[in-house]
């Protein structure tokens, strides 16, 4: 455990391979990833490791369009191309036992992320490639160099400047009077995205929508509508900040606070700069603009954008699977590792969700074949699912209990307590779970059926998104009036002038 807490276990690799790192350091819209990908095109056996399925898909398409055979590999799917020279994948899919001649690790400032940062740590320490390009924000420079030095590898630095100017507007944004084509409106929940989209439609403005629970292919189609000017604006959560290439002229923060899973808090400097940096696109807009709804929010942006970002001083460390060789139950090993203190700059991932799924499975351990097989059980409890979706958790448990009964897993149940968009988004998550769990436990995936179900579900979601979003507009629960953006009480001033009926009071 002590060795694992200083990253030593993750550096165990072919020491005869001398790795050379090229660090591409710069802000958003500086061309750093473009330069790394140009080098990747020359690889005979290369890999791209990015944060999003959409970015892996973008690399996959660009490579194949350029006549370079490229396969895409993510947790949701594998698009295999014969004789491929490049693999475009999400960072979690890295095979640390496979050798490459050139690798690209994108958005490496994510190394400090509480939930996924350990995958970047693993990639930097464990990728087997003679030439590794790392693209990152300047704040990650020192900590990434620290990781490289742990492995006694060489590196060189290439720094980039932003290619388009970024300007904070003097006046606060007024909705909907100030809406312009090319705007991207930033809010921080699905509910808010659909609320704003509905308000825009009320004013004759066609929006694309992007939020986390949308299937990746739907997000891509929504982006395509905006790229092709079939929609005039975008309404998005902070998903827009992670390298998505959109022709955005202006970023409009309608909110400057977000719920982070624990509490509602103001956006931090890095979040604001990452999102604001998406404004302006080289070759299309010479200047990107940033503004906010209301003077108070604009003042917050103005003060925050002038503050230098603090360098990252932590690195996320994942659970080392080498510990599974210990002679102890799996939950005891995980808890023991969790209680141990790592050396700086490492910070261990939160294992609460892993232990939650372990506890869920433990209750049914007598019905789960090979429950004592720690390697297999670890694969099961680390299957990425939304534990807040209890339908999904129940499906996961059914798979744990029945995976040995046939060559393929049972197909997901279409029935759901949810309605509308949420029903189909939840079903799509079930399809993803069917695929991921099958791959983890070595079951045969019925690819044709899965592709057909995904296509039908995506078509239904697109159909629902193309309809009027009036039902999502947040209104006063008493008088039905549209509420001001940011109103969190779901009531307006109507109660100041009229007395609510007894029925309303009961509600």
Report the location of each language-model feature.
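Accessory helical-bundle/CTD segments and flexible terminal tails appended to RecA-like ATPase motors
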Residues: 311-475, 482
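Interdomain hinge/linker at the junction between the two RecA-like core domains of SF2 helicases
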Residues: 145-177
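Inter-Walker segment of RecA-like/P-loop motor cores
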Residues: 67-96
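Single conserved hydrophobic/aromatic residue that forms the stacking wall/gate
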Residues: 2-7, 12, 497-507
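Post-DEXD/H (motif II) to motif III coupling segment of the RecA-like Helicase ATP-binding lobe
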Residues: 113-158
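Conserved segment of the helicase C-terminal RecA-like domain
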Residues: 271-302
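Conserved strand-helix element at the start of the C-terminal RecA-like helicase core
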Residues: 46-55, 181-198
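Conserved RecA-like helicase motor core of SF1/SF2 enzymes
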Residues: 240-278
